Amino acid sequence: MLRGLASLGLAAALSGRGRAFARRDEIEMLVLGDSLIWGQGLREEEKFYYLTKRWLEEDVFKGNGRVRLTVKAHSGSTIKLDPDEQAALERGKRSAFEELHPEVNVSFPTIEKQLRSAHSEHRDPARVDLLMLSGGIPDVGVAKIINPLESNKKLRERIDLYCRRHMGELVAEAAEKFPNSLIILVGYYPIITRHSPMKRIVNDIMELYSVPGWAKPPINNPATRAIWRLWRGKMIKRSRIWLEDSNAAFTEVVEGLNAGSGRQRAVFVPSPIDERAAFGTKNSLLFTVGRKGRPADSIGETRLRECPPALAELRRDTRLKYSTRFCELASVGHPTPEGSAAIAAAIQERLDPLLARRFNGRVQPASK
């Protein structure tokens, strides 16, 4: 008798509306975004969107309902497409809607296009209850974030453009296209911190740029690392600027949407991965380069197979510099299974009060 009531109640709780909902045995969840939410290098069951799905089915529904999952996210996706890349794709007769293997880190289809494709393909967009999203760092650029020679002012301007203005436009469009969805915007984490060892930073940079083995000792040794450390403080500061400014931008986006809607349409979930769990630290929750320069994640062999032919064709057709090595090692700096689980727990903690308010303090809606 309670079957279906869980879905009905959860949909009402997530939408924030008091209107009646059709009796349903499932809710629908849409996942859009970049490599963070895609779960670069992770098996499906390790990804935080999947862990959220399982939590809803097992702990919230108590087995009395299911979550229907649609994933459009992929590695490298930007919010919008750079005009120069758009022109190069057109010259090469390549579509910006083309879908490569999602582990291959290219900017297209953009998150905007993911959103519009999901909307056009859905029979009833009003039935989507949860829309989980991440985006912005591929637009800003990790290399630009940690580059100690670039201007902090320009970094802040890039973060404002992509994480506040472009993300704001995207979230507003998502709210319009999926009018009953709760949008979960997932934040990022610090990249390099005072706990990140210089040896690890230099080693992984050399691997990403395919520095030959004979050249590594002259570049990465105690004497040269002293020179690198002159830049380390600037890299750490820029990483902190990225974290603080992107979090502030995402918070503003969510608060603006909620204020304009007159109800809670979106929540922002800051990353639980802090400075001590950042890149290369003793207790890191992020992937580094593996032994002998190979990927350290369980999906690395897939990228070693998929990246070379896909990017060779793109380079030939567009004359753009898509890096095969960056693609093969794309898991570097992304959450490990433990990091993904921590993000899933943060999402669950953020959703708990939304459900509890609807169900008198009980997260589990299918109660007697």
Task: State where each predicted segment sits.
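Solvent-exposed loop/turn segments at secondary-structure junctions
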Residues: S35-W38, H74-I79, G136-V142, Y189-T193, ...
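Short, amphipathic alpha-helical "lid/cap" segments that border enzyme active or binding sites
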Residues: D160, R164, G168, P337-Q348
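Oxyanion-hole/transition-state-stabilizing segment in secreted/luminal serine hydrolases
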Residues: L32, L89-I159, I184, Y188-D204, ...
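N-terminal export signals
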Residues: L2-A20
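Mobile gating loops/cap/lid regions near enzyme active sites that modulate substrate access
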Residues: P197-R240, E244, E252-G256, R263-H334
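Serine-esterase "nucleophile elbow" of acetyl-processing enzymes
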Residues: F21-Q86
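Charged, often glycine-rich, active-site loop that binds/positions anionic groups
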Residues: S75-I111, G280-A296
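Structural recognition of the beta-strand scaffold that forms the well-ordered cores
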Residues: E28-V31, I37, R68-A73, D129-S134, ...
